[in-house]
């Protein structure tokens, strides 16, 4: 991988660590705070790698914190999946695993502190009134409850906590600046009433802190030095700093924002991905067409390819969209170096070598990976009857066709012999059911004894008498539109009806019969494939195409 210069986040950290800097002499301490209301996707992966990778680069530490302050859609299923995904990518949080909800008591105490300082008040504007009184760029916001006495605020807030009021009756708001040009500073809501069971706290709490209040407090309580987050929180940073500076937290983290990752031909909104799952438009969160990490893993993506992708696109302040083909390019690079080669015939037709002795078979040595001299060779059986791709034979060839056709040029069977097509056999409907050819017994290994030039192509094959049957799933982009998330489009209407093709009756090298997930292979001429981790089983092999051989990424 090419050398990557320091990004702007690292430049800020260098300034903070320098003598006289904000965190001089301190250990860099970051955190990754996913909300456990869905599965991590490739967009989260960029943030994850920035958080864990930055700490790793500076010899620091990174916490994993479940941001579970909103109880509406959070579930332990997602908590477990998030941990699995992070470990799969090669990162570890050690003993620094936390839940935002574990700080509810402390967060409540800080809210009381703000009330006592005259910096927070209980407001009873309804959501509709809140919008009405919020003002605009020329007119300040208004709240008739802003000057409520401190003692009354304390009493009402405690009664909110005790469950004495219905949802929406009261909120706790910060008292900052109703005329601020930054609407996030116009007395934002800090707490709201919600009667909903929390996945960890149960029904202990009926008031829940807003993200903008809870997040800086959680960072400070964990002694985070650098709170790295996506760019939409840039306008929230003044509020983050206001909270940190107005409650008695033990540390003062610095928030730094970076641009989110956008990729064409996909959507990364959890809400939109959830709809695909709930409406059965995909098979689940781990559908290999999904941008979730569990989906990418099932499709055959490797941790190295995803980390390489995120590291090479870099860290920016300006949002941009990356080509999905670049992610494929990174996977292709990784698998080209490491995946074992194998032969698989996906749309088979029988090839009979008429001058090969009946009942005879032999074993040929074929290389496992030409890019890895230490990968060695494997034994592949060969006999009179083989399976080849149906497209490797044409009864009437088109111009420049160099594969098998009657009286055409010699072709090379990969690692085996030279053959020459002599004809074909058809069924009563005129379908080709068998290709006929002769072989040169002196060309074992694929090279003629007399050194003559082979004008035909090299094709792959499988021994029809010693092979494994499999189902093969060919995946392509879930969306046919490069920008399905555009504001003027219904992303559901952009779904690609040809994003999955299922092939049955495929013929594979016998050694693949024992392959198990997460084994990955390059099927010669076909692409890179992996064993499906969910549906494949002994006696019912299922392989997923991770990526095609052809690289469409424009370097």
Range-by-range predicted roles:
Residues 78-104, 110-111, 118-121:
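A glycine-rich helix N-cap at a beta->alpha junction
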Residues 251-330:
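Long, charged, mostly alpha-helical binding arms that flank functional sites
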Residues 22, 91, 120, 166, ...:
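Intrinsically disordered or highly flexible coil/loop and linker segments, enriched in small
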Residues 5-13, 18-84, 198-230:
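N-terminal catalytic cores of NTP/NDP-binding nucleotidyl/phosphoryl-transfer enzymes
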Residues 33-36, 65-73, 95-105, 128, ...:
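Conserved short loop/turn motifs at secondary-structure junctions
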């Amino acid at each position: 991988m090419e050398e990557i210069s320091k990004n702007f986040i690292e430049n800020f950290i260098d300034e903070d660590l320098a003598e006289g800097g904000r965190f001089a002499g301190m250990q860099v301490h970051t955190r990754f705070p996913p909300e456990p209301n869905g599965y991590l996707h490739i967009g989260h992966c960029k943030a994850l790698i920035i958080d864990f990778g930055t700490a790793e680069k500076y010899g620091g530490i990174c916490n994993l914190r479940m941001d579970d302050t909103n109880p509406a859609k959070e579930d332990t299923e997602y908590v477990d999946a998030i941990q699995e995904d992070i470990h799969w990518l090669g990162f570890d949080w050690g003993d620094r695993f936390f839940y935002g909800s574990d700080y509810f008591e402390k967060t409540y105490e800080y809210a009381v502190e703000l009330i006592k300082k005259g910096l927070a008040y209980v407001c009873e504007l309804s959501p509709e009134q809140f919008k009405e009184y919020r003002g605009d760029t020329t007119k300040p916001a208004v709240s008739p409850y802003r000057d409520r006495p401190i003692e009354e605020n304390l009493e009402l807030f405690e009664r909110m906590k005790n469950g004495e009021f219905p949802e929406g009756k009261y909120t706790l708001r910060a008292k900052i600046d109703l005329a601020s040009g930054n609407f996030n500073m116009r007395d934002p809501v800090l707490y709201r009433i919600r009667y909903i069971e929390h996945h960890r706290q149960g029904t202990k709490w009926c008031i829940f802190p807003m993200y903008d209040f809870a997040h800086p407090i959680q960072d400070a309580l964990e002694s985070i030095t650098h709170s790295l987050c996506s760019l939409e929180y840039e306008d929230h940073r003044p509020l983050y700093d206001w909270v940190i500076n107005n409650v008695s937290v033990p540390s003062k983290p610095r928030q730094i924002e970076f641009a989110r990752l956008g990729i064409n031909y996909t959507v990364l909104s959890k809400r939109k991905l959830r709809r695909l799952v709930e409406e059965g438009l995909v098979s689940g969160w781990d559908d290999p067409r999904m941008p979730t990490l569990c989906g990418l893993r099932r499709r055959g993506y490797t941790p190295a390819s995803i980390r390489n992708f995120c590291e090479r696109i870099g860290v920016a302040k300006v949002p941009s969209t990356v080509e999905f083909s670049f992610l494929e390019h990174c996977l292709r690079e990784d698998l080209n170096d490491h995946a074992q080669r194998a032969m698989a015939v996906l749309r088979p037709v029988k090839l009979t070598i008429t001058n090969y002795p009946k009942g005879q078979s032999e074993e040929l040595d074929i290389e496992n990976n030409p890019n890895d001299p230490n990968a060695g060779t494997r034994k592949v059986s060969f006999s009179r009857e083989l399976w080849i791709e149906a497209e490797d034979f044409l009864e009437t060839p088109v111009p420049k066709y160099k594969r098998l056709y009657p009286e055409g040029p010699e072709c090379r069977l990969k690692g085996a012999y030279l053959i020459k097509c002599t004809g074909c056999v058809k069924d009563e409907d005129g379908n080709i059911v068998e290709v006929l050819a002769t072989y040169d017994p002196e060309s074992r290994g694929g090279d003629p004894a007399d050194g003559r030039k082979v004008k035909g192509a090299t094709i792959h094959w499988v021994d029809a008498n010693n092979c494994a049957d499999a189902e093969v799933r060919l995946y392509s982009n879930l969306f046919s539109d490069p920008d399905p998330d555009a504001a003027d489009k219904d992303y559901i209407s952009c779904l690609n009806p040809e994003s999955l093709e299922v092939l049955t009756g495929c013929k594979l090298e016998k050694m693949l019969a024992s392959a198990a997930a997460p084994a990955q292979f390059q099927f010669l001429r076909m692409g890179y494939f992996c064993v499906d981790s969910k549906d494949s089983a002994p006696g019912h092999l299922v392989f997923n195409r991770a990526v095609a051989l052809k690289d469409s990424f424009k370097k």
